[in-house]
Structure formats: C-alpha cells, structure tokens
Amino acid sequence: MGWNHIIVGAGSAGCVMAKRLSEAGRKVLLLEAGGRDNYHWVHIPVGYLYCIGNPRTDWLYKTAEEPGLNGRALLYPRGKVLGGCSSINGMLYLRGQAADYDGWRQMGLTGWGWDDVLPMFKRSEDYVEGTSEMHGAGGEWRVENQRLRWDVLDDWMKAAEAWGLPATRDFNTGDNEGVGYFRVNQRNGWRMNTAKAFVRTTQGDTLSVETQAQVKRLVIEQGRVVGVVYDQRGTEKEARCSGELVLSAGAIGSPQILQLSGVGPGALLQKHGIAVQHEQPEVGANLQDHLQLRCAWRLKDALTLNTLSATLWGKAKIGLEYALRRTGPMSMAPSQMGAFSRSSERVETADLEYHVQPLTLEAFGQPLHDFPGLTASVCNLRPESRGVVEITSPDYREAPRIAPNYLSTEGDRAVAVAAIRQSREIMAQMPMAKYAPEEIKPGPAYQSDEEMAKAAGEVGTTIFHPTCTVRMGADEAAPLDAQLRFRGLGGLRVVDASVMPKITSGNTNSPTIMIAEKAAEMMLAG
C-alpha cells in the first residue's frame, strides 16, 4: 500500500493523529516501538504500579545524576506500548491554565491562545456531566468522576480551604486555583488510554498499525523527509509516504530520533559519527519537567490505604470490590485530591500543584508503610530550569542522556522552599488536627530556607511531565513553526509534548491530546 502519512509513535498524540487523518481518507501507517496494550494491568487503574518499571510497557529510562537533587539519578518512566504514556500515567484530566496558552500566543504563536485551543479540548472530550461552555460530550476521550472518596482527603480539603484556597469541582475552566477531587480518564472503572479511545474506534480500512517497530532513523532526501527505516523484531524495514511524516515519539523519543537522523546540534552529531543532514542546535534542548516534592505525614486513627491493605483480608476485600463493582482502591488514580495554589502573593496565577494521596511509602515501587499516612506531593508548575536530551551513541537501541537540570536556578529553589512551607501550613490547619500529623518527609529537622532547599533536593522526583524539547516558536531559532512544521526540512511535522514552547500549569497528557487535535486540523486544511 502507498502511504499518504507515516506516524512515528502510537502514544497520546500519535493515536489521535492516526484516527483523524485516516478517517479523512488518508492512508496512514502508525508505527509503535512497544507492543499491543493487551497487558491486563494497562486497563486496571491501579495497574500503573505494575506498568512503570516493567520492560513490557516502559522504556526504563534514567536521568543523569542531578546536581540539584544532591547527585541522585531518577527513574524516568515513558510508555512503550500502544497508547504510550496514556497507558501508564495517572489518568488525571487537566488542561492547564488559560494564561498558559495566551502566553504562547503572546510569544507570537498565532492560533494557540486559550480561545483557540478550547474547542480542540472539547472536540475529543466525553465529559461525564455533558456539554457546556467549557466541556464537550460524545467524543472519544472519556472524563469521569473518581469512584471512591476518603474521609482523610475530605479533611485535607477542608484544611486547604481553612488555609485560604477555594473549593472547586472543576480544574479545567481556565483558572485552576482551588482544591478538590481530580477528574480522571476512565470509563466505568477501567483506564481509558488513547489506543482504546482513538485507534480502536477508527472507521474504515485506511489505517495500518505496526507494533514492535522501533524507528532507527528518518529517510531524508534533498532536504525532505520521505520515510523511515525501522527495526521490527530483528528485521530492518523501510516505509515511505507521499505526504507529511508525523513524528510523535514524545519529548524524549522525538529529539532522539531526529538526532539519530542527522538533525540536531552539529557538534553532538559529529561526536557520534552521524552525518549532519540539518543542523538545528535546539533539538533536544529546552527540556522542562515538573519536579514533585513528596511531603508525607504519619497520622493517628485515620483510614488510609496503608491500613486498608495491611492484611490479607484487606487485600482480598479490595480485589473483590473491584471485581464486583469496579470501585474501591483498585479503581484509584495515583492521586485523588488536588490543589492549585500560588507560592507567593506576587504570582498572578497558581504556580503550585498538589497531588494528595491517602498513603505513604519510602519510595515508588516499595511497600506501603504499616501505619496510617498521607502524602501531599507539591510541584512547581512553571520551572525556570532547562534541561537537555542527547543521544549517547549512533545506535538507536541506546537510551539518550536525559538531564532535566532540576533546581538549577535560585528562583526554582525559592519556590521549592515556599512549597514545603505551604504544605506544612495546610497540614497545621484545624481539620487535620484530629489526626495528630507527624511529618516524616522531608522531616521536622529542616526549618531554615537553606535546610529546606537541601530537603527539596532529597525528596524531589519527577512527576513524569517532560516537554518542550522540539519547541515551536515564532523565532527562527525554534525547530518548529506555529503549524508544527520543521523549519528547514520539508515533509515533517512534530506532534507531541515536545512541541510546547513552555510547559503547561498542570499535568501534560490532555494538552498533548489537544495539540494532536489541532495538528490534525491544520494538516487536513492543507
């Protein structure tokens, strides 16, 4: 078959692009390096615990040792499966703030303001409460309420209100400041990923999906991308398309593939013996991510997941509840309660996000503590720190160097200190007093600004939102223009979280789906 388009990466963006282009009559080849999403833990909400760190579903990346994290290297999960990160993420439906997108437009990116992107969010949305000025219904991307509540989280919400945050039922109206329960991408207690939502619902026969197909490089002829060379189960194959190729391999994979293809910083490519096809210094630069500071407390006389799952009977009860009703802890998103607040009065819109969980543990992947506990992870939504993604070898199988450069600016360290102080102030409010909270992370020993900045380096970890590594911009230095076309190369658009010029003020999965909706519209309009 002669392909009109090849899409590299069947993740959050690629699956959307595949459906929109193929249903418009284009012949589309969708390539995914991972396997099919038939692993049962992909679809059970709590299954992220078994997908992250699993080579069946995760690229198993690690960061470089980070000076801002006191020399620690972090695990850096990315989805390697149909659906990409939407198959292993926290399922939270969050758009960010109107100010994020209006800021993009003010940077010269015409068509990317809040009023421009809101219809794109609504297009794919299937909102549990139906259509409204802010929400869509009948789309592929299901948004539901969570299927359980916790008294301890209700009390944390009251504490946040006592501290000064307004209660909210909807973080997605353009101004997300407030506290409330997150809404999630689930349907009837099952995870909704983009493979299920978009690829499986595609009508017609113009879409072909190939899994276990890892792209080695783009094929570039006379300044135009015309196809890809990929490995599929040990066999090298080549595919070509007559129209544009869409690179949707994510904020790590897209710059890596470009660099392997000879598109990127010239010195880096030459260092690894790769012929420079098109020098573009910013490919892989500008990495932005949200760093979460895991603040945690031991509680007295509280029902939390720690205590609920402490016995075999408790675990059996949890499993039975999910099997019979699709409710209970197995239907949980990793974080149930959320809040958006400002780190200081000088900040115009919320720059902190809380992910609040009725559980504590020493580190991700380790057992829950044997006492009642609550975690309130707080992250800086608009970091100043900028990192880099760079190939380490001409071999496509070698992981790139990922250096987020967390807490590398005075401003980011100051926000981290303010975030820890604020989390303590909320826990000190009267609604939480009955639990006699005892801080275990970072711990009461850290009190001065200098001590808390050090503590941020000890408890900080990624919240899995890498972006901006192949940014769009009105300036000629940006790899992409506002149409997501690659400057200086024909036949190529990049469509994923890497294209953001600045990270959004919230979780990044739904903005990535919006970007794909807009990209498909632009491509189909010619």
Where are these regions (language model features)?
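N-terminal glycine-rich phosphate/pyrophosphate-binding loop and immediately adjacent elements
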Residues: 1-122, 279-280, 290-299
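FAD-dependent oxidoreductase catalytic-site/capping-region signature
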Residues: 2-3, 118, 124-173, 179-182, ...
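Glycine-rich loop(s) and the adjacent beta-strand/alpha-helix scaffold that form part
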Residues: 23, 27, 35-37, 218, ...
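Short, hydrophobic/aliphatic alpha-helical segments
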Residues: 60-77, 238, 450-457, 494, ...
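Conserved redox-cofactor binding core of oxidoreductases
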Residues: 105-225, 231, 294-316
